[in-house]
A protein has these predicted regions:
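Catalytic-pocket segment enriched in acidic/His residues
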Residues: 34-36, 217-339
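Short, structured patches in soluble enzyme cores that scaffold and shape functional sites
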Residues: 50, 137, 159-161, 168, ...
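Short acidic-glycine loop/turn motifs at beta-strand connectors
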Residues: 61-66, 191-193, 263-264, 328-330
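Structural signature of FAD isoalloxazine-binding scaffolds in flavoprotein oxidoreductases
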Residues: 148-167, 183, 320-329
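N-terminal export leaders
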Residues: 5-21
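Secretory targeting signals
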Residues: 1-3
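A generic local secondary-structure boundary/capping motif
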Residues: 34-37, 47-49, 122-124, 144-147, ...
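N-terminal non-catalytic cap/leader segment that marks the start of a structured domain
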Residues: 5, 12, 28-154, 323
Length: 339
């Protein structure tokens, strides 16, 4: 058949019709054009897998049958599903993912798409958010331990995509630039739909899910570079995140225990119930000034127990070889090593 424009268009519409009935695998470029229903995924524990230690990232779902490799299942079942966490969030293809998972759990054909979690190499939970917004001094005792005023409204700063890091990864300490490296366990909000000037009462409906994160920090750069925070917190690899995102329907974000351990020793132990600005206030407040987009993430502040909060003669800063473990109740334990 001659590849006239008309034939190509006709071919695309046949593909779309077949896809709508679940009859054919749809390439991503084609899927972008499909009228898939928009919405967030529900009832799922999600992760990013990486293959061959490369930036070949794929969406995974933790199930009772193991980790479902979403792209592999979509191919086996010949139905569309978003292939990466960023595709899921930014295209708002939650319903397609829920359909795929429900089908895969009962279809014999999808069996090869389940893998053992022990064999999975984790990638950064998200890899291309449009924004990473961070809230500082959001726990009273942490504000007090650092000698700061307890803020009346959330104190905002930012990180960048190049900060993103993964569960079981490493943070390379830039020892030529800084010496005072510190941990900050934090709950991370993952945004699921566009939020602009949203009222507090509705704010939680804009969250796709929640994850464990660490707002890793070089204190000397944070406090000794002219009174601005970003440079101490936006260094490459300084935003470990993961291993999982739990969908928002599974989590009460304002009532989660959180902990940080260094080489097995507990350093931080608190609850998100102690946050000054709760989750709905943070989303609402940020959305007054900055339009939040699906796939954006928000670091929500750390509780007391950081090295900066100790008396000066007891401050032993982190060093290469230290192993950090951060956990949030239900959301999983994030581990990484300093090199
Ligand atoms: Mg922080």
């Amino acid at each position: 058949m001659k590849h006239t424009r008309r034939n190509v268009l006709k071919g695309a519409s046949v593909l779309a019709a077949a896809a709508a009935t679940g009859g054919i695998a749809v390439p991503q470029a084609e899927a972008n054009k499909q009228p898939y229903p928009k919405g967030m995924a529900h009832g799922l524990t999600l992760l990013t897998m990486r293959r061959n230690s490369s930036e070949d990232y794929r969406l995974g779902v933790k199930t009772e049958k193991g980790i479902l490799d979403v792209a592999a299942a979509a191919k086996l079942l010949r139905i569309y599903a978003p292939e990466t966490m960023d595709d899921l969030l930014q295209r708002e293809h939650g319903p397609a993912l829920n359909t795929l998972v429900a089908t895969a759990l009962t279809a014999a054909a999808a069996k090869p798409a389940f893998v053992k979690e022990e064999t999975v190499e984790y990638g950064p939970l998200v890899s291309r958010p449009a924004k990473i917004v961070c809230v500082g001094l959001n726990y009273r005792k942490h504000a007090q331990e650092t000698g700061a005023q307890v803020p009346k409204e959330p104190v905002l700063f930012n990180k960048y995509q190049t900060c993103l890091n993964r569960h079981n990864g490493t943070v390379k300490l830039p020892v030529d630039l800084a010496k005072k490296f510190d941990y900050e366990v934090e709950m991370v909000i993952v945004i699921g739909k566009e939020a602009s000037n949203v009222p507090e009462a509705d704010a939680l409906t804009y969250a796709a899910g929640y994850a464990t994160g660490n707002d890793f920090t070089a204190r000397d750069l944070q406090y000794e570079t002219g009174g601005q925070w970003m440079i101490g917190k936006a260094i490459d690899q300084f935003a470990p995140l993961g291993p999982y995102m739990l969908t928002a329907d599974l989590v009460d974000p304002d009532n989660l225990k959180l902990e940080c351990r260094v080489n097995g020793e507990t350093r931080q132990s608190s609850s998100t119930a102690d946050m000054i600005a709760n989750t709905r206030h943070m989303i609402s407040y940020i959305s007054r000034y900055i339009k939040l987009k699906p796939g954006d993430i928000i670091f929500t502040g750390t509780p007391e127990g950081v090295i900066q909060g100790k008396p000066k003669d007891k401050q032993v800063w982190l060093k290469p070889g230290d192993k950090i473990a951060c956990s949030l109740e239900k959301l999983g334990e994030l581990k990484f090593e300093l090199v």
